[in-house]
Amino acid sequence: MMRWYTAVGVKMEHLGGLFCVQVGTENKILSGMEIFIWNALLWSFVEETQIYGRMVQLLKAVFPEKDLDGKTGKDEFNFCFRRLITRGLIIFCECETEKEAAENLLQNAIVARVMRNSGERFLMFCESFACGTPFWKALSVFKKEPMEERYGQFLLKIEKCGEVRYYLETTEQPNEILEMLSLLYQKKILFIRSVKEVTIES
């Protein structure tokens, strides 16, 4: 079994300029490396051994002038990583595949539509570029996502009720709903606002 992680919460504007994430109804302030770990896991399902490398790539994208290597801030990373789990800002499950992880984590989620202000679009650009997307392609986040039009009616429903369990219990095709939600999440159209319950296998 592999352990897969993703980020929880909705990035919020903060009057003091702090990095604020809302999980459920609670606002939580992130600082230092916490910010980069959270962003490295946002809109993706990442196997545990890949997380540190993704975070380093994100740091390189944001601070290209700094000399970063494979040992950069490892102790700080471990501390911040554990802290994010404790604070409910990242969640995990144990599955064999990324697809199984997406279904496991999303089925208990409450999701929210991404309201794409300039700050969020910039974060999406940084995350995409850090994951190896060519610069010109990463810039596409500043354009309207075609899938927002394709799934427009469903997204309007999400704005009223983001509880995934509700849609799974009121449809004859729950697997298709989960696949659609996974696609919308990984296309950076949805946030996971919170998770009601996650069963974690030991």
Language-model regions: role of each:
Residues M2-V46:
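Short, amphipathic alpha-helical interface elements at domain boundaries
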Residues I29-S202:
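Long, charge-rich, low-complexity alpha-helical segments
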